[in-house]
Amino acid sequence: MKKKKFTFWKLLLILLIIAVIAAAGLYIAVTHYVSKLNFEDTSGEDNFSIVDSLADGATGVKNILLIGVDNDYAPGMDELGNADGLMIVSINPKTRQVVLTSLMRDIRVQVPDSYKTKLTLSYHYGGTQQLIDTIEYNFGVPIDNYVLVNYISVVNIVDAVGGLTMDVTADELYWMDDKIRSVCDLVGASYEDNMLSTDQAGELELNGIQTAAFLRIRYAGNNDFERTERARRVVLGLKDKAAAMSLTELDSFANTVLPYITTDLTQTDIVSLLLRFPAMIKYDMISDRIPIEGSYWFTNDDNGSFVDIDYDANKEHLQSSIYGGELS
């Protein structure tokens, strides 16, 4: 009996040591990666408390706002630019879904305790926290964290995964040409090495420059409505590429792209997401957009061109989509 008891405690000690080493390794790895991010702490700033207005279905859901800006500078610099692309990534463990919800940049919104303007300009005039406050105030969902990138970020992120396969129409290729030129000028690359022609329409392997140009198109198809769809396709493509990477490839990817990302995700947040990642990649991916069909109209006035929306219908849809239709 004593021998068995000794063996049991010895095994328990070995398992404990392994657990401690694994935890220490995870801590060191996360610390290494977090140090490469551009961290912007917004935790001490005013924030509209929306969570209390939601029912219990909101518990456990994490909403991360993806912000794509057109400042043409590395994230973290003072030049804000406009919020060119906005997407709420909602992770819902209860429904086992990740919902990607694009927000149209030209929606007319009420900036809390201030003026009305386009959603994109609420970032330009007030930065990240004002943008988050505006989204929470107008759409009734809490934003837990944000991730900010610009077109230089996109070039580096897409190249780091080896490019993305996209179905591109001739109309999109036509409008991409000028955007490819401007992105090449931005990053100091050759236009001739990256140009595409309309007769190449179909399934294409896009590099970082071409993907950034693909995201910048505004006038192909249904204008900005299709632009939001292209953004969701790119995010889904990046997710698929990351999910297929080995640990070595993921390490190289993280070291390459993290310096091009600004976020308020803390070390604790990142550890939590890493631990949930193996489960999350198996979640259903839902693609959505605000405004929903039949709930918007276009307005031109002295302040510009706007997308005006039925807020009640869109808030109800957004909350139902994110929280699984279980909110009261």
Where are these regions (language model features)?
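Entry/capping segment at the start of metal-dependent catalytic domains
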Residues: T7-R96, S272, R289, F306
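Extracytoplasmic/secreted envelope proteins and their assembly/folding machinery
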Residues: G85, K116, T128-E136, Y151-V155, ...
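Second-shell loop/turn segments in exported
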Residues: Y73-M77, T117-Y125, G140-N145, A201, ...
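Extracytoplasmic
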Residues: T59-K62, G81-L86, T95-L103, S114, ...
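Soluble non-cytosolic domains of exported or imported proteins
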Residues: E79-A83, D113-S114, S122-Q130, L148-I152, ...
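Amphipathic, coiled-coil-like alpha-helical scaffolding segments used for oligomerization/assembly
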Residues: Y125-A189, T266
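C-terminal solvent-exposed extensions
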Residues: G44-L54, T59-V61, A74, L80, ...
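Flexible, polar/acidic helix-loop-strand segments at domain edges
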Residues: T59-G60, D159-S246, S328
